[in-house]
């Protein structure tokens, strides 16, 4: 059955809606006070409604109720799929919509406000930590829809999975807090909630034309009405937006866009007005510090293992911890900045399933070794069983620039100090063995039919036999030894961080990683070897160390092939890894074959 199309003017709708909500006779002055519409406009609208049979004896009639039906809200969609990265570290433990603010769980308060307005058809779109929301179906009768693309797409993916449900629909975010109920059973037209911001702002600033229609939106501005909170789609908007979304959804450039960006790009075709709310009614929290400012008791009532770890480690109260912001979010780690007093720190939270990827006990053994040697001054403490770690934050630091000889020299000497420490680690790490492990993963997706793959593999295995025969020593090694894992402080001092892959390895392993991942030229690589040895390396040493460039390249090449088989796109790194394996292997094999096998070993000198 096709929904009816509304024929009321805005003033007529306002008058009838006021009478519907009151469910009692109202004078024109009472309607004026309820709708904030001028008395003259109210008078004209009342007379028109009386003439149409919508009002009798200052009450809404059955015909008036029927005239409001096209404006009845069908349903609501609450988007709760996102990672909420800016809300670190709390979002590491639970989704933002499940936080308790002023004594109420954010999404539960919003559902109850929708129910109070008579809206019971509610869909919650979930993704990250979706299991935290499942109970809402039993408790509140909501429908749960899973957005599996929440990692790879912005919130347009959440509207995509419910696009057929869009009609007269409220579209909400699970983490908003409304101090008064903004929801209504009947709404005249599509709108975006807005609050006024004085002075400069980085919020989305709205420009309007006649009737309050939104004509443009800019990111950032000053003294402006800004997008803030919930949105209402009427049927016309939903139909138009769904058509546009279906046209652009598969385009690669659409994936990272907010749905609002898609709307703005087609703003001429989609009618939506601005609805103004007084300051303080709509509350969006972009950081932990913001919600703490809104609810002073938030931290005291927060059940968080992360904050317990911080408080116990640093001997502070939970309310002493401030200035949170995310640093990075990846496959193995989630990291955020925080401060206690004037001191700054980093909290590392283990990613989901990383206990199957990373040997945390080996990592922490290496972290303690690096701290003892002064190679990593940032590490404070952590828990190898649970995977969390607290480190010092180095302000104004940057990553290593391997093109600067002085910095490359400092890095290679640091590696040499690690190797000469006389210490040992329980774990062993070998690039070729790791590559073979990745190869087994790759085979799980079908036969390896990459041209000349097995030819290259055979050469790598032969080179490994020759390099092993050199009998260079095993030593504690970082094994992820490249510029992004170095921090350079303002004085130029280095710290080597992220020891997840550390173990006992051939002393050439770290050199191999540096050449591959920093994409050093042959001349730069040879210079790095001179820095490492403190002299010009012998031909035997050079041959052996450059072999580990091949091994590192091949290992990560096979890893990249496996990731591509899984559906990930590693980009140009697949080629970079491949080239470092294939470009050197023939030359090195020839060097080994022509070298005298009885060439004496030359011990490196410091």
Predicted feature locations:
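An alpha-helical support segment within catalytic cores of ATP-dependent transferases
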Residues: 305-323, 423-479, 491, 581, ...
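ATP-binding pocket architecture of kinase catalytic cores
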Residues: 325-432, 439, 446-455, 471
């Amino acid at each position: 059955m096709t929904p009816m199309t509304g024929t009321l003017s805005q003033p007529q709708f306002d008058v009838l809606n006021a009478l519907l909500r009151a469910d009692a006779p109202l004078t024109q002055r009472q309607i004026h006070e309820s709708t904030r519409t001028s008395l003259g406009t109210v008078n004209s609208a009342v007379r028109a409604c009386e003439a149409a049979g919508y009002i009798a004896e200052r009450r809404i009639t059955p015909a008036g109720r029927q005239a409001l039906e096209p404006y009845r809200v069908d349903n609501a969609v609450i988007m709760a799929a996102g990672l909420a990265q800016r809300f670190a570290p709390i979002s590491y433990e639970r989704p933002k919509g499940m936080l308790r603010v002023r004594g109420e769980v954010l999404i539960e308060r919003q559902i109850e406000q929708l129910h109070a307005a008579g809206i019971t058809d509610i869909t919650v779109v979930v993704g990250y930590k979706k299991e935290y929301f499942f109970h809402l179906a039993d408790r509140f009768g909501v429908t749960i829809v899973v957005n599996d693309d929440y990692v790879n797409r912005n919130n347009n993916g959440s509207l995509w999975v419910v696009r057929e449900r869009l009609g007269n629909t409220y579209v909400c975010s699970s983490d908003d807090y409304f101090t008064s109920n903004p929801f209504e059973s009947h709404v005249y037209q599509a709108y975006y909630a807005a609050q006024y911001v004085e002075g400069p702002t980085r919020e989305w600033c709205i420009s309007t034309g006649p009737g309050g229609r939104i004509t443009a939106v800019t990111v950032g501005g000053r003294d402006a009405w800004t997008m803030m909170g919930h949105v209402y789609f009427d049927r016309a908007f939903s139909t138009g937006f769904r058509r546009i979304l279906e046209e652009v959804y598969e385009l690669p450039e659409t994936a990272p866009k907010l749905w609002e960006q898609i709307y703005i790009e087609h703003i001429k075709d989609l009618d939506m007005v601005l609805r103004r709310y007084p300051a303080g009614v709509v509350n969006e929290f972009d950081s932990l510090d913001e919600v703490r400012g809104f609810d002073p008791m938030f931290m005291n009532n927060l059940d968080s293992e992360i904050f317990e770890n911080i408080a116990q480690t640093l001997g502070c109260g939970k309310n002493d911890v401030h200035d949170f912001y995310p640093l990075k979010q990846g496959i193995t780690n989630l990291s955020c900045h925080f401060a206690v007093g004037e001191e700054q720190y980093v909290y590392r939270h283990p990613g989901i399933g990383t206990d199957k990827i990373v040997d945390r006990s080996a990592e922490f053994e290496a972290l303690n070794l690096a701290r003892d040697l002064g190679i990593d001054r940032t590490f404070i403490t952590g828990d190898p069983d649970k995977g969390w770690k607290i480190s010092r934050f180095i302000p104004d630091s940057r990553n290593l620039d391997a093109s600067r000889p002085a910095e490359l020299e400092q890095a290679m000497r640091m590696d040499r100090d690690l190797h000469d420490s006389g210490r040992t680690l329980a774990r062993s790490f070998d690039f070729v063995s790791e590559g073979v492990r990745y190869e087994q993963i790759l085979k799980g997706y079908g036969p390896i039919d990459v041209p000349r793959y097995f030819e290259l593999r055979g050469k790598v295995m032969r080179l490994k036999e020759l390099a092993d025969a050199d009998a260079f020593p095993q030593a504690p090694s970082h094994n992820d030894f490249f510029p992004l894992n170095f921090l350079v402080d303002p004085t130029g001092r280095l710290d080597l961080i992220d020891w997840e892959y550390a173990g006992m390895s051939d002393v050439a392993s770290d050199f191999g990683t540096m050449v591959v991942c920093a994409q050093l030229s042959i001349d730069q690589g040879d210079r790095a070897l001179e820095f490492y040895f403190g002299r010009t390396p012998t031909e035997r040493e050079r041959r052996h160390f450059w072999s580990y460039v091949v091994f590192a390249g091949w290992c990560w090449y096979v890893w990249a092939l496996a990731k591509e088989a899984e559906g990930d796109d590693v980009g140009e790194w697949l080629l970079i890894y491949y080239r470092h394996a294939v470009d050197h292997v023939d030359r090195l094999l020839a060097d080994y074959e022509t070298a005298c096998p009885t060439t004496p070993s030359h011990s490196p000198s410091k």
